[in-house]
A protein has these predicted regions:
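Extracellular repeat-rich scaffold modules on cell surfaces
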Residues: 102, 172, 243-246, 250-252
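Periodic glycine anchor positions in long extracellular repeat architectures
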Residues: 34, 40-43, 58-61, 105, ...
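Acidic/polar low-complexity surface segments
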Residues: 1-28, 32-33, 50-99, 121-169, ...
């Protein structure tokens, strides 16, 4: 029998006026083994997923999949107006202080704005403490897994100005993890592995053919996603970063 291929998963906040956020809930979400997709939405959520290659968004966002293969194409956190299209002023967003825990596996976690606690076990994990996206290449590796192209933080609002980042606590297990904590006073602990840790904003790009890490940079982007804003607008963080054994790259910001 044929199996349907998922095209996209998107959170939508609809209001009568089309421009303001609805009241949100503090959700408790638990899943078992398997490759899960979870969008917590706004509010103080508690999300626990077991082993598997999971995708978790602590607040609002979208996940799209490649049309033919069904592999992951893009994962992004975003705060949308009632029409579901353009970002609104971040002052209107009731963000959540989320608690996110996962089992072993290659997880992607975009915690979103707020003071989040993220705990991830062993695996080649990608964790963004605040806003950002993971863009995949249009190819798979030898195991049939989607290959990353870019992982980046981004701060979006209607006025191209910075959003206050959260004071996040991020802990990962053994494995080659990628962590972009984002703005705010963050506490980051990674275990053994060839880890990449950015204490504030930045991006990592990957080689097209091999999928190996190509470029790592710390930067602060406007809401177009490419031009650097004046540093006086950035509310940077006093971060605490601890790593285990391995060939780590750390840019504290």
């Amino acid at each position: 029998e044929g199996t349907s291929i998922l095209a996209s998963v998107v959170s939508i906040n609809l209001s009568t006026g089309g421009q303001t956020f609805l009241p949100t809930g503090s959700d408790t979400i638990s899943t078992g083994l398997g490759n899960d997709v979870v969008i917590g939405g706004l509010g103080n959520d508690e999300i626990t997923v077991a082993g598997g290659d999971n995708i978790i968004l602590g607040d609002d966002g979208a996940i799209t999949f490649q049309a033919t293969s069904g592999l992951t194409d893009r994962i992004e956190s975003r705060y949308l107006d009632g029409a579901g299209a353009s970002p609104i002023d971040a002052s209107e967003a009731v963000v959540g202080n989320d608690t996110i825990s996962t089992g072993s596996g290659d997880d992607v976690v975009l915690a979103g704005l707020g003071d989040d606690v993220v705990t991830i076990l062993d695996g080649a994990n990608v964790v963004l403490g605040d806003e950002g996206f993971a863009q995949y290449q249009d190819q798979a590796d030898t195991s049939g897994t989607a290959v990353l192209g870019t992982v980046s933080s981004q701060y979006l609002d209607g006025a191209m100005s910075f959003v206050q980042g959260g004071a996040d606590s991020i802990t990962t297990g053994d494995g080659d993890d990628t962590v972009i904590a984002g703005l705010g006073n963050d506490d980051i602990t990674v275990a053994d592995g060839a880890n990449i840790v950015l204490g504030d904003g930045g991006s990592i790009t990957y080689q097209l053919t091999s999928g190996l890490r190509d470029r790592i940079e710390s930067r602060y982007l406007d809401d177009a996603g490419f031009a650097a804003l004046d540093a006086t607008e950035a509310v940077v963080g006093n971060d605490t970063i601890s790593t285990g054994s391995g060939d780590d790259v750390v840019l504290a910001g």
